[in-house]
Amino acid sequence: MSDYESGSDIDNYYEADEFDDFIEYSDNEVEQEKSKPTPGQIEVEEIEEPEEDRIRTLTTTLKPNETQAQKLLKAHISVLVSALGGPDHTSDIQPPPYKLGHDALACLKDIKRWIRAVDEKKNNYEVALACAESGLVTNDLIVIMCQWEDKMQKKEIIKNKTTTEKTMLACLELLVLLTWPVEFGKDLSESQKLLYSEIKKVHVSYKKQILMFNNGQLLKAAIRLVLPTIAKSRIDREPRDNQILKLVLYLIRNLLAIEPANLSISNKSRKGASVTASDLPLGVTQDDISINNVLSVFKKNKVLMLLLTISGSLGTEFDRDMFGEICLESIYLIIKGLSASEVLVKKNLGSTPVAAPSQNTVPDAINASQPLQPVTTTVGMQLQDLLATESKKKKIQTQNIASRHGRFGSLLSIRSADSNSFVVSGQEALINTDSSLAKLDKSKKWKDRTYFKYDSDEYVNTSTPVYLNLTGQDILYNFVEQFLSGGCFNNLIECMGSRLTSQTDLNMVDELTLASYFFTISWFLSYQRERIGLDSENKELNYGSVGAALSEVNFILIIGYFRDSFSVKKWNSLHVAMICFKELLQISNSVFGKEITNQTGEGDEISQHEIDRELAEGIIRKLFSFNDFLSIIVQIPQTAAKHSPDYLRVSVSVVHILLKAFETFANEDVHLYIQSKRKQSKRNRKRVNNLDKSTEDRLRDVIYASDEELDQSSAKEITQERKLDFKKTEARFFHQAIVSTYINYLSRYEDLSNQEIKTCLSYFHRLFVVRKDFTGLYRLDFMQLLQKLRNYLQRGSSLRLQVEEFIYYFMKKFKTAFERFPMPIEVLFPRFEDNECKVYLATGEVYEKEETTSTSRSPRLAKDLEFVRDFGLDDQIKILVSQLHVQEKQSLLKWLIQELERIINDRILNSDSIAELNASNQQRRLFINNGYLRFLLRIIGFDLPYTMEEVPELATTVDMEHLTKVTELIKKWDSSQPVIFEDDKVPSYFVRTREAGYDEDQYNENDQEYDFNDDSIAFETEANPNSNRNHVSELDHLEELERQLSSNGSRVNSKERNGTKGKARKKSKEKKRPEPKKVRGLKRRRIPKDLLDDDDSQHVVKSAEFVHDSDDESDDEKDKAFFEREEKMRNLLNDMGGIATSEQLKEIQKVWKNLETGGNNKVASTVAKAVKEVGLFVEESDNDDEVEEESRNSAPVNEEADRTIFESGEVDTQQDLSDNTSNTSDMESETETTKRSFVEDPEEISHVQPKRKRLVISDDEEE
């Protein structure tokens, strides 16, 4: 044909930037491209640089607000469009065909360059509007592509086929650029904001022209361009082929996304938005761009089939990263603004079925017997909705007006108690008092009117309501069914889900992509759920066609999407997340609400029911896995009233479904476990036996053998899993902020359906009747709302009867509360959520906090106290009672006096009874952490407790005289407060903390005698019964053992002073002897200097019977047992860092004895001297006094000398040691060093010097 004949120069005309807008270039290429000035920029700069003559400018004909540069730009675009081609009037064909110009392809490329140079880089719409004025899309691009499609359909021969295809692709690319949807946002420039409404009208006109020209033949031409690409296998496709397919999908997406501009950009005035004539360009109606027309054109031109093909083949035949997002957005735009019920439920057009009208017949409007044709236009359906709303309001308005006097006016004067008159006009004011006051309230002008913020509906609703006629409903129903049955939905969701999970942060993904993903999931879940509900014959819950939406990946994504949207306050995204969350809950509830039809129970049906229950429980367990997610769900309804009505409706429905689900789970005995993460608190961590941190860490090394468990215990965050308590969780949804949300929602009762009103009533019924939280609804706004709702509802309706019953019960309870509180100021405000306010308003009593037993936070043991000097018993009681009064413990003293009197009475009846104090948990804590109370109890004669489970016990040795005297003194000084001491000193001045270490007077007074020749002293495993820490672990047994061993010599001397053995000693009144060296030696014992000075000195150790038993074992058995003990001891000491228990000391003693007997003389001398000087073991010789005295008089040495002696011992004895030797000597030294640190400063254990490297003195090292 001559229409497409062109020169050879056009055949060879090809540039690399044909699809440069849709091909990703590297950063260097982009910078080079930006640095090069385009011809359009040069011309514009040359035009704007010279100064224009003012007279010439004034005389030039320009449009309003149009510059000379804009006029020249439009002229240049007009020239390019004219050079592109036009109708060939020389042809005999009518209408005349379109003929391309000689440089048509170059003109198309120049126009694209102008768009890139001006519109994209300068953020403007100048070129796009110039193209619209020139009629580029309407008169050129659409005609060119449709004419090419006709020739291809008729299989006509086209010359220069390559150039023609390039021209078609250039036209397609320009169509995509000129129809790209625009959104009003902050990123728009000032010129774009001014031209926003104009460019939106241009897009609407493009949409109409594409859909209406030859019934959308342009779409068929675009699909024909992409057919060769689809026919190729994925391996054979080139990047250019993928870009062509992407262009076609973008064109489909653009047509679906084009909508008329909103009436206003404000978030406060979008209610009931409707398209007016000013929002549409001339010659365009709502039917031209409606979803019905779009679906009809798409079906006719195989567009829906193309979407099904690509969606079902993503990941296999087509790249999911390149095409998945576009397909998902196209599906989302098709279903946006529509509910699943609108697609499923067929509209009822009357009792007589109406046949589809023939295209060749016109309905007879005069014939009354012919049924009315259904309304198929968008304007007609919108008019039907308006008429229905009008009739509803008219019915409500006229139901209380008498028909006889309805046409007459009325004037009513109302006089208040303060003689003020108010005039009300109108017939409705005469009905009753409520109507009169309501009429009076309407005349008030409110200063602060509350508006809804329409800031959360962008991804859920369209700018204008969507009306679906029968044709569109049928097309969409068939498309959705094919989309589900063909597996396209599951494939699309799986591909997009894997793509989203590959992103490290969802905030980096486009917000529209995430919204379209979750909205599509929620819509198809709703569709499948309602389809199953409508199918009364098939009771099987088949969610296989939407199974990909119920996968583990989607639950992770929805929880993350929920959190991110709420944290950054993206209300549009949060609205979509709540809709998806609501659908998942409704699916779970529908499974639990299903009943088995055959009660006898067929096997298949019961097994299917169990499978469905597992599905429902799996949904709930995955949704409620984290505590922070549940907290977000509780917080969302508290502020829902500040957003759009749809957002508020979804929030209320989510709460309603959740409460219903919790009730179902409790009845079905479903157990949910929720995870909570918290930061590890060092202060609140439970200590093992109340030890300090360093000791606890060493014990953990022994308890937890693996490093993995140790790392887990020292993690910064602790994850706990606990069972979800449905009752406590349900109580969180009855917060006063959520109650206010429900009241605000119900206040719009005129716009709510009966089912939505019942939802609100069920919430209030659950709060007021079931939970009996009466004060939560004693609010004036709620009472007024109930009265208005009752008057609004039609008389005799079941809903009004329910409201009246609730009002009757409510006022009955409120009347009782009003009699108790004659001035209920609280009804004016929402109730405070603290327990004190709740209990007081409900019962009239002051709230007392319940005592809870805290096992995680045990009280800290108070330090032991003593008086600064000797006081008599009267002064002692006086000081301690006065100090407890200073601490405001008067009630504690009263209770103690009562307990002492009770104990005295019990002792009179039974003198041998052991009395205990009947204390509460709070008093038990004081027994441990209050040093003054412990001191007082110790003076009385009680055995002090050390844990919350223990109570003070009064032994039978305390006589009645002492007990009665102490009780009278406590009474005396308790009633004589305040007491003035000498020099106005406070009572705590006369009390001080007892010094740590050995107390000789206390030992001589309380401790029983030990035979220092008794060998069992060295291996005593029980702690001192009179010690102030008899509940701690074996580490404290070691400390107590050390004190007992080191004080043998002092006890001998004290016996000589106080009397002979077996004779009772009197209480010592003398002060402690000043022996600072001795006390310091008790805190830190060191190796004497003579061990360093004389290595040849030997001390005989006669404790061999404790090293090995006198049994009949053979040498092999002894060696085997020895090596087992050696390995066991080495492992224990390595794990514990040198800390040994009493059983381990036995093992150490045996090894040391082997060293002494098995080595040479030098080794035996060194071992014997170390055993004697360190003082761990008791010798059998009779010269214990000399040994103890020698150890006491020896001067300590530093740790460096300690290390030197063991190193020298290793060098000298390494060759002489047998296989029975080991590294125990150095371990024992470290044991002593650690114990000395515990004795000296148990609170500062973290400052202990690091351990030295252990010395291995065995034959293994020689090898």
UniProtKB/Swiss-Prot annotation:
GO terms for molecular function: DNA binding. Residues 1179-1189 have a biased composition (Acidic residues). It is found in: Nucleus. The keyword DNA repair applies. One of its GO terms (cellular component) is replication fork protection complex. Keywords: Cell cycle, DNA damage, DNA repair, DNA replication inhibitor, Meiosis, Nucleus. Residues 1060-1071 have a biased composition (Basic residues). It comes from the Eukaryota. InterPro entries: Timeless, Timeless_N. Forms a fork protection complex (FPC) with CSM3 and which is required for chromosome segregation during meiosis and DNA damage repair. FPC coordinates leading and lagging strand synthesis and moves with the replication fork. FPC stabilizes replication forks in a configuration that is recognized by replication checkpoint sensors. Residues 1211-1226 have a biased composition (Polar residues). Disulfide bonds: none annotated. Belongs to the timeless family. One of its GO terms (biological process) is DNA repair. Component of the fork protection complex (FPC) consisting of TOF1 and CSM3. Residues 1042-1098, 1178-1263 are annotated as: Disordered. It holds the Pfam family TIMELESS. This is Topoisomerase 1-associated factor 1.
